[in-house]
């Protein structure tokens, strides 16, 4: 004679064969930090900002010449306006070889640090940069202004340019001339006589220019 298990026994047996509950642990996501650009500066804990780059585009009037470009030792004499204000500074000379520490940025350097007002908490900065595939010499075949220099700016914008020497110009025969002495304004037209071609060569002192925001 077989004895039938009571109800309590059946329930205990059923519980023994139930699958163990699945434990779900919270998934921890690690945030990946994006690398900081050396040209971006943290000021008072603010996140890094992208700094705009302005291109100096020129269209000189050439006679008997095929190209015009900055020479070695050429400084940039610029006028600036305050990005977040109305202050302006004129005739500021920027030396591409000069290096100054960027405020509140470890190891970063630039070519110009300036304040429009002594009360400004944060200084404006400018770096002379090389934009590959964009900057080049102006040629006699160009019909519009071309970019010959680039400036990465924070807190200021370039609004004016005074050409200062030296610049290098070339003839079709490959003869090169320096236009203007180092650090001197091109206040007058430059002219010379090219013996190889037997023709006069010249650069008009009134050089058309404009600043364009680089969208690279």
Enumerate the language-model features and the residues they cover.
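Eukaryotic proteins' extreme N-terminal regulatory segments
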Residues: 45-77
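Structured domain cores in non-transmembrane regions
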Residues: 65-77, 81-160
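Intrinsic-disorder-associated, low-complexity terminal segments enriched in Asp/Asn/His/Tyr and depleted
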Residues: 2, 8-10, 42
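Glycine-rich, aromatic-bearing surface loops/beta-hairpins
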Residues: 149-216
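Compositionally biased, low-complexity segments enriched in small residues
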Residues: 5-6, 28, 35
């Amino acid at each position: 004679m077989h004895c039938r298990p009571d109800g309590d026994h059946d329930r205990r047996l059923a519980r023994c064969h139930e699958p163990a509950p699945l434990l779900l642990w919270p998934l921890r996501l690690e945030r990946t930090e994006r690398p900081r650009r050396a040209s971006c500066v943290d000021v008072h804990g603010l996140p890094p900002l992208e700094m705009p780059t302005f291109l100096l585009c020129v269209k000189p009037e050439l006679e008997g010449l095929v190209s015009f470009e900055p020479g070695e030792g050429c400084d940039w004499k610029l006028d600036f306006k305050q990005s977040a204000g109305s202050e302006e500074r004129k005739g500021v000379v920027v030396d591409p070889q000069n290096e100054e520490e960027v405020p509140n940025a470890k190891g970063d350097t630039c070519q110009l640090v300036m304040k429009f007002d002594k009360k400004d908490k944060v200084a404006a900065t400018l770096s002379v940069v090389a934009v590959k595939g964009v900057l080049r010499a102006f040629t006699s075949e160009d019909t519009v202004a071309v970019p010959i220099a680039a400036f990465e700016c924070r807190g200021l914008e370039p609004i004016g340019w005074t050409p200062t020497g030296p610049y290098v110009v070339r003839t079709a025969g490959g003869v090169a001339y320096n236009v203007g002495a180092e650090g001197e304004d091109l206040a007058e037209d430059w002219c010379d006589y090219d013996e190889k071609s037997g023709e006069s060569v010249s650069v008009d002192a009134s050089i058309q220019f404009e600043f364009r925001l680089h969208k690279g």
